[in-house]
Amino acid sequence: MSHEDRGGDYYPMMDDPEDRNFIQAKYPNSTGHMSSGGGSNHMSFDDNHGIEMLRDDEHSLLHESPVSIPAIHNLDSFLTDVYNYFRGKGFMCIFFNDLFELVSSLFVVLFFTFLVCFVDYSKLFSEQMPPPALRESVNFSAPIPIWLMVFLVIFSLYWLSKLFSFFSSIKTNWEISSFYKNTLKINEDDIQTIEWREVVSKIVLVPRLCIVKENMNALDIANRIMRKENYIIGLINQRILNLSIPFPFLRNLTFITKTLEWSLMYSLFNYIFDENGIIKSEFQDPTQRKRLSRGLSRRFMTIGILGLFTTPFIFFFLLINFFFEYAEELKNRPGSLFSREWSPLARWEFRELNELPHYFQNRLNLSYSHANQYVESFPSQMLSTIAKFISFLFGSVLAVFIVLGIVSDHFIMNYQIFDRTPIWYIGILGTIVAITRSLIVDENQVFQPAKHMARTVQNTHYLPMSWVGKTHTHKVRDEFLVLFEYRIVDFVRDIFSVLFTPFILIFSLPKSSQAIIDFFGNNTVVLEGVGPICQLGDFSNIRKLGDNSFGSLNHSQNKISLTNNAKLEKSIINFKCLNPEWNTDNNELLQNLNEFSKIKNNNNNNNNNGSNNHIGNHSQLPTTSVDDFQFIHDSHYIPHEIIDAVLGTHHHSQQSNNNAPRFKTGRVDQNILNAVNDLHQSFYESQYKHKNDNFVNSI
């Protein structure tokens, strides 16, 4: 198959050194550059116990060795397509998902146009008997308003571009399907249930997939797929982006929406990265930063000004799309819009470096029930009392209408009450009753906010120092609700962000341009076989980049390079949990944690032998309320390190024991166990018998 036939993503394998050098020179994305950071990790079935654990039986997919393929000149794009294919669950699922998305958007616009232009509502709502036929109420010869015509033209251009992308993706996905089937030996049925770890384990065994590194590893693949996203995670973590609304009384509101995300990434990625997804060399030149900063500011303002012209149409489209998407759900489940979900800002706060989207989504999914239980631990008795009263009044009337409707169909369809039939009142009353009942406090609910927060932290890996020991307070709850908000609030913000985003781009983000350029320049390193990446994703320079309050060994004074809330440490541990085969022999952080864990275990054993004030492995809590003891009793689901972190008892237990180890590790044990708890719901659950500190000893 020729280069043209393969869609331009493949190059024939070249054994000649001159040809190899040609590819390296022309496509740095596939070659990378040599540096001291990173290193190859040779993987085989014989010396890698992580892969052995993946084998459920002797017929595991891993028994079939991948075959060689032609060298690929844009390995980032190829691996991203491979991952998206895995996430989309195969060719047919991706095909129909994209097709239905196209058809749905077209249907929304055409149906709305039909309702606005061609329906004669004067005849439709007339009271003449018999009612007019449908053809009398529809007039396809009616003129289309100018504003709607402009909207339809803009939408048509957008829809045609999506259609072109759809046909282009068919060819790409077909090639990726062949790669899965012929090279990785994974068929369409297995792609529905296979773990990404197993896909990675097969990818790294494909001969000569990367022409400048003999063996890729899981970290190389993650860094290629998330080459750009790691920079965004770092920018959010270090609070570099100015996302405030530049209006009086709104300047303290900082939020991220889908519209703002798209605008920000479009502004940055097309400016900073080349066509192969590699950061341009000029951004690593300190003498060019002033010029690049001015250019980025102009780019923000230009995109913001263009956004002002498209704002009415995007706002209009989102509004009608919301109506068609949620009307049926609002009718059948009125309370669903008042369910809660993590805000986009919270998602970026929780997202860890080199954490692929499906892993991250799994963490969020596991956290929802516990987060809701935490919020419900702060009931408003007054609101509940009012809601119960309203529900009783309207529910009584609703019950009468339903009973009368069962007795007589004529009553429910024709009887007039203030010019409305009972069926209309049933719909309104049913909605009110559903909403008010969702606000009534469960009488059997037990107040245990600390326990629910601990379980939430297990999955979000997010616990600010200001929350420790205060999770029962309304102050912490209010801060938590900023991150965990109503769905309807999220949608309303998305709608109005279309109005605010252009002004944020024009007035707020340009103030961050210099800091953004400095961040990209200061935080770009070259990883062997991968090329220029965000140094936070390298997972090697812990002393310079880590958070010393979380045991990172950090002694650097360069504030722009530091991470907050142990982002780097948590990311390393989480990545190790998700990829046990990743070689970490030279990782300072994991070596330090291993030593800390051993000493901590020895210290705990000594404490247990010499003290009677322990329940299991837990030090006596500073308080002795019934809730605390119940929390201890239930803590076999939650590692005691997380309990200590949430209740703020870690330092108390250290003060009670003068022989406790005095590492510069702060609450590092909480971070270890946060990540280890991911294993509880993972593929490896059955493989690990010791899910807590024993896991760290085995790293």
Swiss-Prot record:
Task: Give me the reactions it catalyses.
Answer: a 1,2-diacyl-sn-glycero-3-phosphocholine(in) = a 1,2-diacyl-sn-glycero-3-phosphocholine(out); a 1,2-diacyl-sn-glycero-3-phospho-L-serine(in) = a 1,2-diacyl-sn-glycero-3-phospho-L-serine(out); a 1,2-diacyl-sn-glycero-3-phosphoethanolamine(in) = a 1,2-diacyl-sn-glycero-3-phosphoethanolamine(out)
Where does the UniProt entry place glycosylation sites?
A: N139
PANTHER family referenced in this protein's UniProt entry, alphabetically: APG9 AUTOPHAGY 9, AUTOPHAGY-RELATED PROTEIN 9
Q: Where are the transmembrane segments?
A: 99-119, 140-160, 386-406, 421-441
Instruction: Give the matching Pfam families.
Output: ATG9 (PF04109)
Which keywords fit this entry according to its UniProt record? Autophagy, Cytoplasmic vesicle, Glycoprotein, Lipid transport, Membrane, Transmembrane, Transmembrane helix, Transport
Could you tell me what this protein does? Answer: Phospholipid scramblase involved in autophagy by mediating autophagosomal membrane expansion. Cycles between the preautophagosomal structure/phagophore assembly site (PAS) and the cytoplasmic vesicle pool and supplies membrane for the growing autophagosome. Lipid scramblase activity plays a key role in preautophagosomal structure/phagophore assembly by distributing the phospholipids that arrive through ATG2 from the cytoplasmic to the luminal leaflet of the bilayer, thereby driving autophagosomal membrane expansion.
This protein's name = Autophagy-related protein 9
**What membrane topology is annotated for this entry?**
Multi-pass membrane protein
Q: What is its main location?
A: membrane
Q: What induces it?
A: Expression is up-regulated during development and Legionella infection.
* Chain spans, region Disordered: 599-620
Q: What is known of its domains?
A: Forms a homotrimer with a solvated central pore, which is connected laterally to the cytosol through the cavity within each protomer. Acts as a lipid scramblase that uses its central pore to function: the central pore opens laterally to accommodate lipid headgroups, thereby enabling lipid flipping and redistribution of lipids added to the outer leaflet of ATG9-containing vesicles, thereby enabling growth into autophagosomes.
Q: Which GO terms describe its cellular component?
A: cytoplasmic vesicle membrane; Golgi apparatus; microtubule; microtubule organizing center; phagophore assembly site; phagophore assembly site membrane
Q: How does it assemble?
A: Homotrimer; forms a homotrimer with a central pore that forms a path between the two membrane leaflets.
Q: Which domain of life is it from?
A: Eukaryota
- Intramembrane parts occur at 300-320, 488-508
Topological domains, Lumenal: 120-139, 407-420
Positions with biased composition (Low complexity) = 599-618
- Report the gene knockout effect: Displays severe developmental defects as well as a strong phagocytosis defect.
- Give compartment(s): Preautophagosomal structure membrane; Cytoplasmic vesicle membrane
